Amino acid sequence: MTSTLTISRLTKRFEDVAALTDVSVSVAAGERVALLGHNGAGKSTMMKIILGLIPASEGRVEVCGAAPGSREARRQVAYLPENAAFHPALTGEEQLRLYLRLRGENPRQALPLLERVGLHAAAKRRIGTYSKGMRQRVGLAQALIGHPRLLVLDEPTSGLDPVSRRDFYALLDALAADGASILLSSHALTEVEARTDRILILSEGRKVAEGSLADLRRSADLPVALNVTPRNGYASEIAASLPGAIEVGGLLHLTCSQSEKLAVFGRIAGLGTKVADLEVLPPSLEDIYSHFSRRDGQ
């Protein structure tokens, strides 16, 4: 599969401070990759290098087959910052028409773009009356000008309500289905858990983990939580069969390692109809992120 973004052994220093050290990653066409890390981990620095805003100190970065910041790369890359800012006196349509002209595109595309992000009905309203979610949608519409092959999104859903977040990710899913590559940073781990194909975790400027959620779960080897619901009258008997189980509110809670999981499932299955229900809770992305991004002294 062709890579839209290729980063090889990227290092960035600011005088004696290393913001990024020996980071390698690639993003394929149609792939959605989450970029995670604590404040100061190097996420923003990586994005600035990809966009050609600052140079790398060492390593190789290729954006759509071109150098970052080159005319060819800029033509195929779109960026959406955490807080998209627009002139409050302009309408949504006027703002898009302005950007279309600047990009050498037909201004008549403004309304179709606004319709694509769900803002057609508000196209004639001034942006100063828009909510945060609506302004982010204007930013996304702007990012879609020219059919970019790579979208770089910095905390794109910050400040959005749950419905706006859901709709925003639905738009990203459609873009990825059309072949666009998406690299997004976010602190909202629960939402990227189900809406990205791969996860990259940075800590203190280094890549500490990369892979699908399933890959990271296997690598972290964190315990699995189980909630067992006993049928009436069988709680004590079931608890005796499951060492370490704790009864809380009629449920039996226990944890086991990944290697013990199948054996524990077998013991529970052996209890037959004495068990009314079983809930399996694998490690969440938040658990995995905390595991990999743990720093000295934490």
Please place each PLM-identified region on the residue numbering.
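ABC transporter nucleotide-binding domains
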Residues: L5, K12-S203, A209
